[in-house]
C-alpha cells in the first residue's frame, strides 16, 4: 500500500489513532468552527478538553493549529465541509452539527476518513413548526402586506380601500395543507394546522404505515398526488442528492393554480428561478421562504429580487434562546461522549455510522490527573502573535494555544463529487432514524 493510502504510521484509510490523554499528554482540542461564543459549551467540556473558537466562514480561515490538532469540531450551518476540506483536518475524530441538518457536511467522506458526524435533531422542533405556521397564516391573511401598506402611508378606511389592500386574503377552514416529509417538524406542523381547520395531507415514502391513522391525517402515495390536492404546500424533508430542486418548473406546474408554497427546511429543495417565474405569472399565489439556495439571502440580488408576493426570513425559523442553548448543550455532551467513550458506540446521534470504516477507542479521561487549562481561545487564520483568553472570554488577539499535541497525517487528494439533481424523487432515508429528519 502506497503512502497516499496511509493516514498515520501505517494505519489504513479510515482508521485514526486513539486520543492520548493523561498527565503526559495535552488535553484534546475541540474547536467551534463558525462561531465565537463558547460560554455554553465550556462548562460541559472544560474538564476533558481545551475549547477554542475559529469564527470562520471556510476552512481557509481556520488556523493551522486547529487543522493539525483538533480532535472535535462543533459547527453551525454557515460553513461547508467537502472531502477536500475534511482532509485538511489531521486529527479530527468527530464533528457535531449544532442543529439537525447536515447537508453542509460530506458525511460519506467523513466516514471514509474515520470522522464521525453527529447532529442535534430535536432541539428546535417547536420553533420551526411555529415559524412554519406563522408563514402559512401570513400568506393566507396577508399580514405582512397590510403592515407594509400602512408603513408606506396608504390610507385604509373604506371597505373599498380594505378590499384593495387586503386582496388575496383567504379563509383557512377547509383548505388543504400538503406536507412533504412527516418527520418531527412535519408532524408538529400537522398537529398545529389541524387546530386551524386545515385538512392535512402528507407525502413521505419512507415512513411506516399507520402514522396517518394515529394523527388523523390523509396520506398520499405520490408527490404528484400531494401537489394536485394541496392549496398550500410546505416542505419538511432533508436535502440530499435525490431531491435537489424538488420544487422546480415541472413540479410547480403540477400544483394547483394559485397555491401557496412554504419552505423552512432547506434552500436547495426549491429552484428559485422557477419559483420567481411562477410568482410573476401567478401560478403560485404567494411563497414564504426561511431558507434559500444562497445564504445569506438578499433581496438586492438573485432570481427572487423582483418576485411579488414573497416573504423571506434569514434562516431563523429554528431560533429561540431556549432552543439555541439546548442544542449547544447537547452538541457539547455529544463531544464529551466521544472523548470519554468509544466512537461510534458511545454517540447518541451519529448520522454516518454506516460510512465509518473503522472505530477506535478514545482513552478514558481521569479528571484527577487533568490539570486546569485555559479555554475559549480564538483560532482564526491570520498568522502572527498568539494569545489565549481565559474563562471563555475572547482573546485580545487571534491566536493559538502553545504546547499542544501535533499529529501529522497524509491524505489522498480526492475531489468531492458534485450532486446530480433528480427532481422526481424526494426524501432519502438515513440509517439513524425511523423517519426523515428535519433540517435546521
From Swiss-Prot:
Keywords: NAD, Nucleus, Oxidoreductase. NAD(+) binds at residues 100, 180-185, 204, 237-243, 264-266, 290, 315-318. Its EC number is 1.1.1.-. Residues 429-440 have a biased composition (Basic and acidic residues). GO terms for cellular component: nucleus. One of its GO terms (molecular function) is oxidoreductase activity, acting on the CH-OH group of donors, NAD or NADP as acceptor. It comes from the Eukaryota. It is found in: Nucleus. Transmembrane segments: none annotated. GO terms for biological process: negative regulation of DNA-templated transcription; regulation of transcription by RNA polymerase II. It holds the Pfam family 2-Hacid_dh. The record marks 375-376, 387-388, 409-410 as: Cleavage. Its cofactor is NAD(+). The active site is at residues 266, 295, 315. InterPro entries: CtBP (IPR043322), CTBP_dehydrogenase (IPR051638), D-isomer_2_OHA_DH_cat_dom (IPR006139), D-isomer_DH_CS (IPR029753), D-isomer_DH_CS1 (IPR029752), D-isomer_DH_NAD-bd (IPR006140), NAD(P)-bd_dom_sf (IPR036291). Belongs to the D-isomer specific 2-hydroxyacid dehydrogenase family. Corepressor targeting diverse transcription regulators. Has dehydrogenase activity. This is C-terminal-binding protein 1. It comes from Xenopus laevis (African clawed frog). The gene is ctbp1.
Amino acid at each position: 500500500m502506497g503512502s497516499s493510502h496511509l493516514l498515520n504510521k501505517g494505519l489504513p484509510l479510515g482508521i485514526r489513532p486513539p486520543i492520548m490523554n493523561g498527565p503526559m499528554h495535552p488535553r484534546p482540542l475541540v474547536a467551534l468552527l463558525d462561531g465565537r461564543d463558547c460560554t455554553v459549551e465550556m462548562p460541559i467540556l472544560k474538564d476533558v478538553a481545551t475549547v477554542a473558537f475559529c469564527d470562520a466562514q471556510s476552512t481557509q480561515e481556520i488556523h493551522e493549529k486547529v487543522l493539525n490538532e483538533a480532535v472535535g469540531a462543533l459547527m453551525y450551518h454557515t460553513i461547508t465541509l467537502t472531502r477536500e476540506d475534511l482532509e485538511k483536518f489531521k486529527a479530527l475524530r468527530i464533528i457535531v452539527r449544532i442543529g439537525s441538518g447536515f447537508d453542509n457536511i460530506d458525511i460519506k467522506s467523513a466516514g471514509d476518513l474515520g470522522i464521525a458526524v453527529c447532529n442535534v435533531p430535536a432541539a428546535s422542533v417547536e420553533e420551526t413548526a411555529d415559524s412554519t405556521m406563522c408563514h402559512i397564516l401570513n400568506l393566507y391573511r396577508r399580514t405582512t402586506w397590510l403592515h407594509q401598506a400602512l408603513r408606506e402611508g396608504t390610507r385604509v378606511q373604506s371597505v373599498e380601500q380594505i378590499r384593495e389592500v387586503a386582496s388575496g386574503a383567504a379563509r383557512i377552514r377547509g383548505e388543504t395543507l400538503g406536507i412533504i416529509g412527516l418527520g418531527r417538524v412535519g408532524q408538529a406542523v400537522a398537529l398545529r394546522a389541524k387546530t386551524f381547520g386545515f385538512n392535512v395531507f402528507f407525502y413521505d415514502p419512507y415512513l411506516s404505515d399507520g402514522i396517518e391513522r394515529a394523527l388523523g391525517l390523509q396520506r398520499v402515495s405520490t408527490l404528484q398526488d400531494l401537489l394536485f390536492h394541496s392549496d398550500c404546500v410546505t416542505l419538511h424533508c432533508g436535502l440530499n442528492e435525490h431531491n435537489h430542486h424538488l420544487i422546480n418548473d415541472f413540479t410547480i406546474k403540477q400544483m394547483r393554480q394559485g397555491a401557496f408554497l412554504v419552505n423552512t427546511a432547506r434552500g436547495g429543495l426549491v429552484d428559485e428561478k422557477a419559483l420567481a417565474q411562477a410568482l410573476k405569472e401567478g401560478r403560485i399565489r404567494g411563497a414564504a421562504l426561511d431558507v434559500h439556495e444562497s445564504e445569506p439571502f438578499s433581496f438586492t440580488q438573485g432570481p427572487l429580487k423582483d418576485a411579488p408576493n414573497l416573504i423571506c426570513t434569514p434562516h431563523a425559523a429554528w431560533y429561540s434562546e431556549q432552543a439555541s442553548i439546548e442544542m449547544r448543550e447537547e452538541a457539547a455532551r455529544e463531544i464529551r461522549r466521544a472523548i470519554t467513550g468509544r466512537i461510534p458506540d458511545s454517540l447518541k446521534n451519529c448520522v454516518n455510522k454506516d460510512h465509518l470504516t473503522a472505530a477506535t477507542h478514545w482513552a478514558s479521561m481521569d479528571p484527577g490527573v487533568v490539570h486546569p487549562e485555559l479555554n475559549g481561545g480564538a483560532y482564526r487564520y491570520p498568522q502572527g502573535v498568539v494569545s489565549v483568553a481565559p474563562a471563555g472570554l475572547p482573546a485580545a488577539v487571534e491566536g493559538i494555544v502553545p504546547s499542544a499535541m501535533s499529529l501529522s497525517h497524509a491524505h489522498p487528494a480526492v475531489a468531492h463529487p458534485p450532486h446530480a439533481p433528480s427532481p422526481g424523487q424526494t426524501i432519502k432515508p438515513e440509517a439513524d432514524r425511523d423517519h426523515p429528519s428535519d433540517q435546521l
